[in-house]
A protein has these predicted regions:
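N-terminal signal-anchor/start-transfer transmembrane helix
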Residues: 9-32, 117
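Transmembrane helix-loop-helix hairpins at the membrane interface
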Residues: 98-216
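Juxtamembrane helix-loop-helix connectors linking adjacent transmembrane helices
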Residues: 27-116, 129-131, 210-215
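Alpha-helical transmembrane segments
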Residues: 1-15, 46-57, 92-93, 101-104, 138-141
């Protein structure tokens, strides 16, 4: 096993441990009601735009990653696919672990999705009602770029800014329609973010099932 292999294993172990911790926290009786409330509050307005937003993100990512240097990410440099949170790595291609490890990570990720989305909204969108358009645009860009720290290629991280701008729009919608309170605004953008992430996870699960079927 090479040093790169060891680093990839260490990253997956750290991410898996973190996901387990968040999932366990999400399932505690004191948090479960809050998580269920976020999920039950999802409406068509949160779900319907998701495929269009994802299509825009994907198109932007494909274009940006054609720019030299923007196709680099530290996780891909270690032989990983996409994001360490999905647990994919080229070291497992052709083995049962190609789909088993990502499936285990997804199982841990599912209960954690609502709180992860909520935390990102608290960090990046809270206070958008007081920010100017350029400031909100910069926050959306920061939201995208922070994913580069998590290991995804720079071009893909920049493309995720589109999602950040969409969530900001949802936040402001919630602020206007929710008696101009941050609580209502955060609930609105969190549910939009949760629907977005859940759609991505659903696509990932379909892909993993297909991979498992072909390997079987």
């Amino acid at each position: 096993m090479t040093l790169v292999d060891l680093l990839a294993v260490a990253v997956l172990a750290a991410v898996g441990t973190r996901l387990f911790s968040i999932a366990r926290f999400s399932l505690r009786p004191g948090r479960r009601a809050h998580v269920v409330g976020l999920i039950r509050g999802i409406r068509a307005r949160h779900v319907v735009p998701v495929p269009f937003v994802l299509a825009a993100v994907l198109a932007a990512a494909l274009l940006l990653m054609e720019v030299p240097g923007l196709d680099w990410g530290w996780w891909t440099a270690l032989g990983g696919f996409g994001n360490p949170v999905t647990g994919g790595t080229e070291r497992t291609v052709g083995t049962v672990f190609e789909w088993l490890v990502p499936l285990l990570f997804v199982a841990l990720l599912l209960p954690a999705l609502p709180l992860l989305a909520e935390r990102e909204e608290q960090v990046f969108r809270r206070g958008d009602e007081r920010r100017s358009i350029p400031q909100r645009a910069a926050r959306g860009l920061a939201f995208g770029l922070v994913h580069a720290v998590m290991g995804i290629p720079l071009g893909a991280a920049l493309a995720l800014s589109i999602g950040g701008w969409y969530f900001s729009w949802c936040y402001l919608r919630g602020y206007r329609n929710g008696n101009r309170t941050q609580l209502a605004a955060l609930a609105e953008s969190t549910r939009a973010h949760l629907a977005y992430n859940a759609f991505i996870v659903a696509l990932l699960v379909v892909s993993l099932i297909a991979t498992a079927g072909m390997s079987g």
